[in-house]
Amino acid sequence: MSPVASTCLLCEMRTVVWGWQPAVPQPWHFVRFASSARLARRKPARMALSPNVARSSDRFKDSKKKKPPPTFKNNPFGGMNQTRARLPDRPIPRSDAELKRSSSDLNNKEKDAADKKQDGSLFRALKMQIALSPIPYSRRNRIKEKIAAVTSFDQFPLLPQVREAVYANAFPTLTEISPTPIQRVAIPALLRPPISETEKNKRKKKPQEEEEEELFHFDQFLLAAETGTGKTLAYLLPIINWIKQAEMVEKDTELMDNGEKQQGVTEKSKENLFELEAPELATPEHSNVARPRAIILVPTAELVEQVGKLAKQLSHTAKFRSATISSVYTPRRITNSLFNPAGIDILISTPHLLTSIAKTNPYILSRVAHLVIDEADSLLDKSFSPLTYSIMEKTAPSLTQLILCSATIPRSLDSVMEKKFPEMKRLVTPNLHAIPRRVQLGVVDVDKDPSRGNKKLACADIIWSLGKAGEVAAFLSQKGIHTAALSRDTPDQRKDEILAEFTHVKPLPTPQEVKDAQRNKRNWFSDPVPFATGENSHLGPQRNLRDTKVLVTTDLGSRGIDTVAVRNVILFDVPHTTIDFIHRLGRTGRMGRRGRGIVLVSKKDRKDVVKEVREAMFRGQALI
């Protein structure tokens, strides 16, 4: 708007008549006529058309005749609004950035897949309470390939009498005997030549400071394998083999000493023909009296009996002396076992009892060459470790081999080994920390019907259902009905025999069989009440399972006990850690047998943990 257009009508007339020009407009003039100024402003660009809007573009001259070339873009939205398949004559080149991005994505996917395989993609709840030391699957595969060629005990460098003891005493009822994975791994590693007494005496004595630093200067091994795979035999055979070799070395040394002694006596007798030799006042004491060559430490008296029984069986053929002592024995029996004049080679005991005996008789630990700590995860925890370490220190001067044995490697045991035994060799199996796939795990929600939160009722119902098929079959058999019980607990050989009667057509019956069947039929219908029994009706049915045996135990029975006959394990409470899961479910499915575990869960328990353990068992994965 011009300044003239913003003046009033009177001033404009004066300008026309007298030629008078008004002064420069003031700011208030524009404020006063702001509404008029708004109308005179320049229109925005979005409201103005281009002067070339009516002109046609060269790019769209032939738009009706020819369609624009399609654009192929490799982006998330490149496949939208397509009217035809993108089939170019040659592959579309990709940029360097896109190639880099795709290769990095592929590497990430491969890495994620490897991590998923190693750690377990479904271990979300278990990762919150990791209790076991992990073992890479690459190492598991290497061990599996290494032991694949070992199929017999004859491939081990064992003495003939030791090998014969395995076939005759360890597995007397089996026809085909082959070593388990832990035996294939451990026996070759533990076998070593014996060290003679002369070689021990030739060792140079070290200063006291160096002796303290090298207190545990001996071979150290850790045997770790799943439950029920023969770990006891894996460390017993090398020890027995070493004892027999040491006896042979000592026997040769003794013969040489006796020959030299006899030669000296002969020369002396020639010089003094008329002197009489004084008789010995007492017979020399046996060198093995209360001085065992090997000691096996176990946490409970039940394990003392179990390991001692296996050692006693092997001694019938291998010819060595073993003894067991525990708190359940009388003092007289303990004394007779330790101070037997025939000597002792292997001693099986608990740490408490052996420590108390060593305080009064420290000489008992002066000849130990092999020390085995069975169930090491228990004996090296806070409750047992002071006693176990004291026995280690007292046997260290003569010790040549320390063997730790366990079904699991908890993180606590892993830290102890890294701190105390950094040079320990770990002998593990490919399926360590994995519950065998032949063991099935069932879950019973006690909050649902029919138990409705009553765990005792749910447990009783499960036990009754386990033996119900056999009980019904026995009842029908008593009434003259040919019946056979078939369930999951039926042995495989018996299953084949039972199913053969129902899957194969029998030949026609003989005339004698027809007569017997007709006679039984007449006797059946002649009885007015065929199913009546001699029991009083007012007493009611006797609900008992004669062929079902139940053992109710605490966590004490989940460590090391070789419960071969157990087929079912009921976990009344959900285990707190995966370690307890492995040990408790390990009471069944031992030595290749089938088994079943049943967990009772309620609303207070971690159902997600039980679910992940069950899925890991189904896949054959190791727990964490």
Swiss-Prot record:
Its EC number is 3.6.4.13. The keyword Mitochondrion applies. It is an enzyme of class 3 (hydrolase). A motif (Q motif) lies at residues 151-184. One of its GO terms (molecular function) is RNA helicase activity. Residues 212-427 form the Helicase ATP-binding domain. Its main location: mitochondrion. ATP-binding RNA helicase involved in mitochondrial RNA metabolism. Required for maintenance of mitochondrial DNA. This is ATP-dependent RNA helicase MRH4, mitochondrial. It comes from Ajellomyces capsulatus (strain NAm1 / WU24) (Darling's disease fungus).
